[in-house]
Amino acid sequence: MDRFLSNVTNRIDAKGRVSVPSPFRSVLARRDIQELYCLQDFAFPAISVGGPDLLERYERQIASMDAFSPEANAMSLLVHGGGVFMKLDQEGRLMVTDFVREFTGISTEVTFVGRADHFQLWQPNAFLAAQAEARAGRGFSAARPA
């Protein structure tokens, strides 16, 4: 399958690196994604991560707008000004840079969250809170049947 699914929390090592979960690395390999486009998410305190196709999708949306419109300018500010390219090291680790830490509040652990065509980097407690809020908004209870 070529989708990013599930969520996994991994610890950041002493050098500021975190291992990307194996299933996520497998999707990256199958899609032949060498360079990761990382974007400060528009709705959540998370970093959205995908291949160049993620950036291209946003750029197509911007190109469909009037280039001088406030909407196109705002979108470009978010997509280009809030994005960077990163690469995994040979062991499949990602450097948790200030770009990631300052936007998300991540300090010692990262929760990787699958979002189908991309994944996100979250501070673990922020992810749990957002997930609980999403469930509550859909009428789901956190309680499990006995």
Swiss-Prot record:
UniProt KW Repeat keyword: yes
Organism domain of life: Bacteria
Record-linked CDD domains:
MraZ_C, MraZ_N
Instruction: Please name one Pfam family that this protein belongs to.
Output: MraZ
InterPro entries linked to this entry: MraZ (IPR003444), MraZ_C (IPR035644), MraZ_dom (IPR020603), MraZ_N (IPR035642), MraZ_sf (IPR038619), SpoVT-AbrB_dom (IPR007159), SpoVT-AbrB_sf (IPR037914)
One GO cellular component term: nucleoid
On subunit structure and binding partners, the annotation says: Forms oligomers.
Q: Which family does it belong to?
A: Belongs to the MraZ family.
In Swiss-Prot or TrEMBL terms, this protein is called Transcriptional regulator MraZ
Give the species this sequence originates from.
Answer: Agrobacterium fabrum (strain C58 / ATCC 33970)
The taxonomy runs: Bacteria, Pseudomonadati, Pseudomonadota, Alphaproteobacteria, Hyphomicrobiales
Q: Which gene encodes it?
A: mraZ
